[in-house]
Design a protein with these regions (language model features):
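Short, functionally critical alpha-helical segments immediately adjacent to catalytic or ligand/cofactor-binding
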Residues: 8-25
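Acidic/histidine-rich, surface-exposed loop or edge segments in extracytoplasmic proteins
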Residues: 27-32
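Non-catalytic cell-wall polysaccharide-engagement segments
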Residues: 5-6, 34-111
């Protein structure tokens, strides 16, 4: 269904993004740098909306270019191309792998 990507709900993906981006120690909550937010709760809503909206975009057209939703989300949420420094590109390369790690870690905890 559209509400699940590779067996994960939007909420699970958002929780994994929280950890991928550094959790409580992160300088930018949920990695949100493009817009200002008042607090962690607002940053979570922005992240959740991004996950939900990109799931719809993946269903509409992203599936033509990306093998799965999480790869598409990574291309939007934490790109490795474009106007980025060499350091940002290098750092962002690990984002999808780290996201999947935290998704699987969360799944194991829930069982």
């Amino acid at each position: 269904s559209l509400a699940r990507a590779e067996g994960f709900t939007d909420s699970q993906i958002v929780r994994a993004i929280w950890y991928t981006e550094g959790g409580q120690k992160a300088h930018y909550a949920y990695g949100i740098r493009s817009v200002r937010y008042r607090d962690i709760a607002e940053a979570r809503r922005i992240c959740y909306n991004t996950v939900r909206n990109n799931r719809r975009r993946y269903a509409q057209y992203g599936h033509k270019q990306y093998p799965d939703y999480l790869s598409f989300l990574a291309s939007r949420y934490c790109p490795t191309t474009g106007k980025l420094s060499r350091a940002e590109k290098k750092l962002n390369r690990n984002w999808l792998k780290n996201l999947k790690y935290f998704l699987m870690k969360g799944e194991i905890k829930c069982k």
